[in-house]
Amino acid sequence: GLIASAQAYPGEPMRDPRTMDQVARACAAGGAAGIRAQGLADLALITQHVDVPVIGLWKDGHDGVFITPTLTHAIAVAATGCQIVALDATGRPRPDGLTFAQTVAGLKEARPDVLVMADCGCLDDARAAQDAGADVLGTTLAGYTGERPVTEGPDIELVDQVAAIAEVPLVVEGRVHTPAQAALAMEHGAFAVVVGTAITHPTTITSWFVQALRSR
């Protein structure tokens, strides 16, 4: 099914927990099977107001590991009431010195009721994340960590590779901008597809139309 990602970037007009809560509720009303959101304030509201599973994360910084980068971040995200916590699952150094596997183990010890989504950048990440006990594998970081090219749409080659080894649900995320691309990801083995920008980021959507008109 469809997971709608409701996130706004720092400095943007929609960067407000109440706004993101409304966006998440609107997506759920439209049939989204789940919501992905970031930030403790946003998550605290969204988890109260939607009846679908929420994937929570905490973006801290802009370089290296910044998606729920430490065990402390992960436990705080879990405390907001979300059912799934998303973590950077790459092998890059984490700010607290723990490995991804140690972070998963620590989170599951603290919150055995919460599932872990591994945000992967390549097949090796997915393999290691699955071995570490991740409950969901995501292609979130494909094209952003150096191992994979930045594809025009979702990285279908990586989807095929991960689907072939996955023993847990595979969630395709990253550059899914059309319903056709989402459907293609499902055909290639996705359990669910995350769509963010194309649904919940009007600044970017507007820019697509503006660029198309200017090019004529």
Name the predicted role of every residue range.
Residues 1-14:
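N-terminal amphipathic alpha-helix/helix-capping segment at the start of soluble metabolic enzymes
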